[in-house]
Amino acid sequence: MSERLVTSNEIGIDSTNEYSLRPEKINEYIGQDKVKERLNIFIKAAQRRGEALDHVILYGPPGLGKTTLANIIANEMGGNLKITSGPAIERAGDLAAILTTLNTNDVLFIDEIHRLNRSVEEILYPAMEDYVLDIIIGKGAASKSIRLDLPKFTLIGATTRIGMLSSPLRDRFGVLCSMEYYTDEQLKEIIIRSAEILGCHITEEGAFEIAKRSRGTPRIANRLLKRVRDFAEVLYDNEITEEAAKKSLEILEVDGEGFDRIDNKILEAIIDNFNGGPVGIETLAYFVGEELDTIEDVYEPYLLQKGFIVRTPRGRMATDKAYKHLGRVRFNESKIDSKQCTLFEK
């Protein structure tokens, strides 16, 4: 397949019916209960004071609903949502052009905000603190600074790497929200809701079968639902049952853990070629046939999170959980308890 179905990053298929599947109000939003509770209080307090909501940072893995939350906040505050990203704002003038189009209570959503360059950040500081925009006109000795007033708006920054935000920028956000992976039950609710919007019939068992393979991520859950729906329409009388979901996902090469072919290939390489490890990441990438960065950034995090591999000072090792998943028997004595093993960065 040209695009990986279980990646948490956005791919082409996600744009189909994407906005129709998103909740519009905070009470419609499933999951992230702690974040939702805090934001609900902050929104109501801002409304009672007649103020803009304080600036918000949403951080956590991709696909967990940061853009959806930003849209909900804009709706609740009675403003419009303007979406951009850190890499798209190359110059200070690009940001100034966006800021000057905002109206009161609008929400400016900057995805990958950790990738803003420093010159752009400096424009943001007075805009966030004092709702003003300082513009330099002219060059050299003839240049002069002009200050423009901005409407009271809310900046929402989204990042998968909160540690990469500069301290001056991070300190200007009044609300910091950590987004967590979803439970299978929460994903089941999301899938049932999405199926209703898409007009396909799904049983609770069918929804749960998709949910448990969705890697804790709504974006993946909705993506798998769309593909299973295709199979249901052609092969299963437009009904997604547990059996229909299982067989469809088997054909799509997404197993019961949400692993695809490459995930399993990584585990097979460690166990079959290196007796369970340890094996260096460069060697592992060679055996799997993927780039080193791809292994580290795309595949490894979920395998680590689920406890199928661990990092040690000497390399990656497969856990008993990985052996069981592949139906292999461990013959050596170097058993690993993934709950007790320290995870080393490299």
Curated annotation (Swiss-Prot):
Mg(2+) binds at T67. Its EC number is 3.6.4.-. Residues 183-253 are annotated as: Small ATPAse domain (RuvB-S). It catalyses: ATP + H2O = ADP + phosphate + H(+). Gene3D superfamilies: 1.10.8.60, P-loop containing nucleotide triphosphate hydrolases, Winged helix-like DNA-binding domain superfamily/Winged helix DNA-binding domain. DNA binds at R311, R316. GO terms for biological process: DNA recombination; DNA repair. It is found in: Cytoplasm. PANTHER family: HOLLIDAY JUNCTION BRANCH MIGRATION COMPLEX SUBUNIT RUVB, PTHR42848. This is Holliday junction branch migration complex subunit RuvB. It comes from Clostridium perfringens (strain SM101 / Type A). The lineage of its organism: Bacteria, Bacillati, Bacillota, Clostridia, Eubacteriales.
